[in-house]
């Protein structure tokens, strides 16, 4: 599973591109001012977080679940837990804005964590209203910390929790890179924090004289990191002599089901789309014990674990009489958490389509609707902390996200047989059935922190 965000920070004359995608990388010990610092065991006092500007919250922002009992995972920093919850709030809000702009028959897939990380890296260089809007839109201001600079420390700790797993049966890794124009001197503090917190080293390129070669170099780096899954992520003419910086955040996940679907049980069945039309999908099948619950208005919630149990796929399937669009509009982080808390293990018959989703879209319109206005404005954007000497003519001209998900009998991104055989299915009328033969929501989450890594909807699994 991959997710990719490309954005452009531009000035009156120069641009900065933001790329957030899902690919392969590692979180390691980095060097800051000559001293090796392992970000995963460091204390706040060990890490100098001194961006050019700091946003100070006037008061703690009330949240929907304030006052309720918080079940914070063992050995988890409270602020890291709150950052994970902030990501969930951004995820559901952004998804609703995106779904409103799409046709009900369109598949959707994205990584809210990837998007948040890319814009957190941008926030390092932001000031004034631009910084405040980034804090508010990405829900960073809901964290019980009065200053914006500490968000980066908590991001580092969250990354350590997510990406430094000993489990070898599922792979969740991340990489970041800054590609900067070689003619410019970048703010030293911006570079230091980007590398220390996000592992994003600066690689100089010649955007001014060799824009096309620079584009090819970045695309090649992305292709290599994704094992060739994502190519030409930056389209022709997207980089030119005005480009200043390309920021790349990447996340990649590959997992095998804890309980695999047998290819011999896969057969063609009708999938009923939102518009009333149907298509022929390869429907997988298995019986087993899974965490499941029928919740409000007959909506079914099913959790399928990957090997290792730390990462799971959650499917939300409305009853046939209720549209998925209605569920999407009603979904909040609190509702989702309530549903997950109610799941119970039981014997289940699962019918689920084999599918592959590739999605790509601009983030600009949805983020502007959510209140991130100044960052995209040549007149209002304040990003003086990126280039040396406080240059203040940069803005984000656009931001794009690309994502990829493939699910089959083996799990995610695994090679599997293409044989379709009608055999091996049992009929047990006493067991609960989860049959995803109509549009459903999909989440991939890290269980202990309930971090939403990916989310989307499967509206048409028949798309090639």
UniProtKB/Swiss-Prot annotation:
Residues modified as Phosphothreonine? 63
Q: Where does the source fall among the domains of life?
A: Eukaryota
Indicate the secretion signal residues. Answer: 1-32
Which positions does the record annotate as the modified residue Phosphoserine?
68
Which cysteines share a disulfide bond?
Answer: 40-160, 53-127, 279-462
Q: How is it modified after translation?
A: Phosphorylated by FAM20C in the extracellular medium.
Q: Which InterPro entries match?
A: Antithrombin_3_serpin_domain, Serpin_CS, Serpin_dom, Serpin_fam, Serpin_sf, Serpin_sf_1, Serpin_sf_2
Task: Output one GO BP term.
Answer: blood coagulation
Coiled-coil spans are none
Which molecular function terms from Gene Ontology are attached? heparin binding; identical protein binding; protease binding; serine-type endopeptidase inhibitor activity
Q: Per the annotation, which location comes first and is thus the protein's main one?
A: secreted
Keywords noted in UniProt: Blood coagulation, Disulfide bond, Glycoprotein, Hemostasis, Heparin-binding, Phosphoprotein, Protease inhibitor, Secreted, Serine protease inhibitor, Signal
Q: Which Pfam families match?
A: Serpin
In this protein, the residues bearing a glycan are 128, 167, 187, 224
Q: Site: Reactive bond. Where?
A: 425-426
Q: What does this protein do?
A: Most important serine protease inhibitor in plasma that regulates the blood coagulation cascade. AT-III inhibits thrombin, matriptase-3/TMPRSS7, as well as factors IXa, Xa and XIa. Its inhibitory activity is greatly enhanced in the presence of heparin.
**How is this protein organized at the quaternary level?**
Forms protease inhibiting heterodimer with TMPRSS7.
Protein name in the entry? Antithrombin-III
This protein's species is Pongo abelii (Sumatran orangutan)
Q: Which gene encodes it?
A: SERPINC1
């Amino acid at each position: 599973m991959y997710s990719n965000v490309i954005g452009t920070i531009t000035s009156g004359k120069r641009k900065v591109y933001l790329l957030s995608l899902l690919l392969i990388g590692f979180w390691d010990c980095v060097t800051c001012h000559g001293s090796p610092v392992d970000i995963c065991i460091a204390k706040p006092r060990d890490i100098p977080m001194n961006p050019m500007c700091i946003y100070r919250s006037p008061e703690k922002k009330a949240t929907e679940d304030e006052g309720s009992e918080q079940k914070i995972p063992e050995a988890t920093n409270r602020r890291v837990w709150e950052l994970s919850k902030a990501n969930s709030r951004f995820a559901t809000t952004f998804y609703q804005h995106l779904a409103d702009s799409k046709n009900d028959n369109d598949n959707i897939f994205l990584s809210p964590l990837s998007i948040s990380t890319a814009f957190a890296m941008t926030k390092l260089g932001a000031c004034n209203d631009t910084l405040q809007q980034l804090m508010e839109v990405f829900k960073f201001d809901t964290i019980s910390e009065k200053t914006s600079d500490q968000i980066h420390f908590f991001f580092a700790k969250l990354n350590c929790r997510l990406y430094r797993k000993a489990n070898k049966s599922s792979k969740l890794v991340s990489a970041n890179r800054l590609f900067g124009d070689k003619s410019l001197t970048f703010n030293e503090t911006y570079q230091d924090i980007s590398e220390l917190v996000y592992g994003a080293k600066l690689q100089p390129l010649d955007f001014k004289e060799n824009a096309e070669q620079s584009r090819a170099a970045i695309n090649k780096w992305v292709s290599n990191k994704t094992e060739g899954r994502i190519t030409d992520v930056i389209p022709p003419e997207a980089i030119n002599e005005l480009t200043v910086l390309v920021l790349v955040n990447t996340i990649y996940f590959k997992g095998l089901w804890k309980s695999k679907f047998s290819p011999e049980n896969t057969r063609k069945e009708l999938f009923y789309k939102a518009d009333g039309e149907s298509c022929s999908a390869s429907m997988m099948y298995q019986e087993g014990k899974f965490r499941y619950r029928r919740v409000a208005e007959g909506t079914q919630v099913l959790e399928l674990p990957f090997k290792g149990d730390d990462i799971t796929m959650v499917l939300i399937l409305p009853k046939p009489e209720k549209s998925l669009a209605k569920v999407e509009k009603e979904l909040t982080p609190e509702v989702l958490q309530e549903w997950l808390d109610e799941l119970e293990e039981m014997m289940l018959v699962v019918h689920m389509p084999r599918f592959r989703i590739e999605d790509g879209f601009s983030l600009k319109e949805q983020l502007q609707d959510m209140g991130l206005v100044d960052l995209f404005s040549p007149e209002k954007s304040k990003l003086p902390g990126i280039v040396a000497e406080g240059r203040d003519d940069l803005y984000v001209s656009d931001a794009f996200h690309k994502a990829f998900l493939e699910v089959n009998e083996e799990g995610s991104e695994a090679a599997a047989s293409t044989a379709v055989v009608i055999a091996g299915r049992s009929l047990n009328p006493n067991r609960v059935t989860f049959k995803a033969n109509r549009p459903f929501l999909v989440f991939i989450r890290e269980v202990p922190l309930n971090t939403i890594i990916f989310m989307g909807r499967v509206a048409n699994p028949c798309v090639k």
